[in-house]
A protein has these predicted regions:
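N-terminal helix-turn-helix DNA-binding core of bacterial DNA-binding proteins
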Residues: 22, 26-63, 85, 89-97
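Histidine-centered divalent metal-coordination motifs
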Residues: 36, 69-70
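Alpha-helical residues within the helix-turn-helix
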Residues: 58, 69, 75-76
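Residues that scaffold the ATP/ADP-binding catalytic core of kinase and kinase-like folds
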Residues: 100-101
């Protein structure tokens, strides 16, 4: 048997349990799409911290139903919040969720 101290780097953080791994996998699945990454980027870059779906369709060259579908995936993953105002929905980042991604990437 090989001595782990001679060949292996010790873990600097506790390994993920199954529940946390599933949670983070869902989060990564939500952002593992170029359109959704663009949407997150546009919402993050919005001057007042939120973006209307009506302002996100033309820059991406996508229809409103397609953009709304991708935004729903991001809302369901907890990365965005949605607020209805009349016929439009406005989206804002949930910055705390990005800490989850950041902590995962620093493993």
């Amino acid at each position: 048997m090989v001595d782990p101290q001679l060949c292996c780097t010790p873990l600097s953080a506790a390994p993920l349990d199954r529940a946390r791994a599933k949670q983070l996998a869902g989060l990564l699945k939500a952002v593992a799409d170029p359109t959704r990454l663009q949407l997150l980027s546009r919402v993050a870059a919005a001057g007042d911290g939120e973006a209307c779906v009506c302002d996100l369709t033309a820059p991406l060259g996508l229809t409103q139903p397609t953009v709304s579908h991708h935004l729903k995936v991001l809302v369901d993953a907890g990365l965005l919040t949605r607020q209805r105002r009349g016929p439009w929905a406005y989206y804002s980042l949930v910055r705390e969720r990005f800490e989850d991604i950041r902590s995962l990437l620093s493993l």
